[in-house]
Amino acid sequence: MKIIHTAIEFAPVIKAGGLGDALYGLAKALAANHTTEVVIPLYPKLFTLPKEQDLCSIQKLSYFFAGEQEATAFSYFYEGIKVTLFKLDTQPELFENAETIYTSDDAFRFCAFSAAAASYIQKEGANIVHLHDWHTGLVAGLLKQQPCSQLQKIVLTLHNFGYRGYTTREILEASSLNEFYISQYQLFRDPQTCVLLKGALYCSDFVTTVSPTYAKEILEDYSDYEIHDAITARQHHLRGILNGIDTTIWGPETDPNLAKNYTKELFETPSIFFEAKAENKKALYERLGLSLEHSPCVCIISRIAEQKGPHFMKQAILHALENAYTLIIIGTCYGNQLHEEFANLQESLANSPDVRILLTYSDVLARQIFAAADMICIPSMFEPCGLTQMIGMRYGTVPLVRATGGLADTVANGINGFSFFNPHDFYEFRNMLSEAVTTYRTNHDKWQHIVRACLDFSSDLETAANKYLEIYKQ
């Protein structure tokens, strides 16, 4: 089976969030048994092409977007995946000077790329074309209007339903879409507005989200009734599939960044397992200037953004100070107000023996925190899937979560973690923290059972890939 994914980020090349990681994991698992290709834009300032001798092909092609255009497709293989990067030769201003993936004119940029990608797919042929989020939503309409050879199915995965790609009809008219297909993207209430996600929903053969609970949640999203109508119309061709994590990349067995490696098998003698985590904790605390006197260690490894529940993060700081345990927060702030608030907290708690706030992100430090911490707190307002809780469980770090989206699907309260539900109830959140800390301190048998359940949780990529293959073959 030949599968082509189209997206605007892919973790080995460039990423801004979970989409890039999820696509990488899925493509890697599929590539083990199927011809798998990922098509993304080339961002020259953000990624350097492999040397020419390492490329498997360089193709020139034409596409239509605001007139006849030309592009170059550079292809190479990465871990069995064919990666194709598009340089828009006659529209260089769209990507060549971009210093971030996302800019203010994303709809136009991504539609131009989608037009080039669709032209390439029509030329190359594929059995399955798999789109990721609204960014490449135009590809669905273009391939429905003019299918490629051997095309069996167009699949759309919604990594974050909150972003829809609102744009103008004028931008859709710049493509080769005819009036019928433009109407699939058009809003009835405002014919001059088109929504790339809306058209992709109608033009795709199957729609997936990244967790079963999130699939249910988006059917109850009435923030735009026309988008609600579109997703409701596809509900019988909608399925939630949990993302997986690459256990060859994430795991304490061979992670070179840890002070002490450890394995799930060590848990046959729990004291040896916890001694290994304690060695990692000691090394981390020395690095961060924290006191070893107070346990447990709770961490938050997250973007500090409204989606991630920053109001609960502040409550966690207070709770840690009041109950004498360690809290480590690491993540980049999104938004000036949040940055100011957390920068002030960082400064005021700089000498605290128990709380450390790091307004940055380091992959190495994150791994050391996963290994050292006893619990990881993820109080998201919404979470389509979430990988952090799965990574935490791989390291024997117990998740404390809000029961939403993929967090609800992966964490069972009192079994392999702790959870709360109300997105605005500080009392319920603090009760969850108290229950987790008390269990750690006073009920060692139950704590060991919870950690064991975390280590036994299956989050491998192959499980997710097999579920996608079922959809491809339907």
Curated annotation (Swiss-Prot):
Source superkingdom: Bacteria
Top EC class, one word: transferase
Pathway membership, UniProt: Glycan biosynthesis; glycogen biosynthesis
SUPFAM superfamilies: UDP-Glycosyltransferase/glycogen phosphorylase
Residues binding ADP-alpha-D-glucose, per UniProt: 15
Gene Ontology BP annotations: glycogen biosynthetic process
Keyword Iron: no
E.C. number(s) listed in UniProt: 2.4.1.21
InterPro entries found in the cross-reference section: Glyco_trans_1, GS/SS, Starch_synth_cat_dom
Catalytic activity: [(1->4)-alpha-D-glucosyl](n) + ADP-alpha-D-glucose = [(1->4)-alpha-D-glucosyl](n+1) + ADP + H(+)
Keywords: Glycogen biosynthesis, Glycosyltransferase, Transferase
A GO molecular-function descriptor: alpha-1,4-glucan glucosyltransferase (UDP-glucose donor) activity
Similarity field: Belongs to the glycosyltransferase 1 family. Bacterial/plant glycogen synthase subfamily.
NCBIfam families: glgA, PRK00654.2-3
Job of this protein: Synthesizes alpha-1,4-glucan chains using ADP-glucose.
UniProt-listed PANTHER family: GLYCOGEN SYNTHASE 2-RELATED (PTHR46083:SF1), PTHR46083
Protein name stated in the entry: Glycogen synthase
This protein's encoding gene: glgA
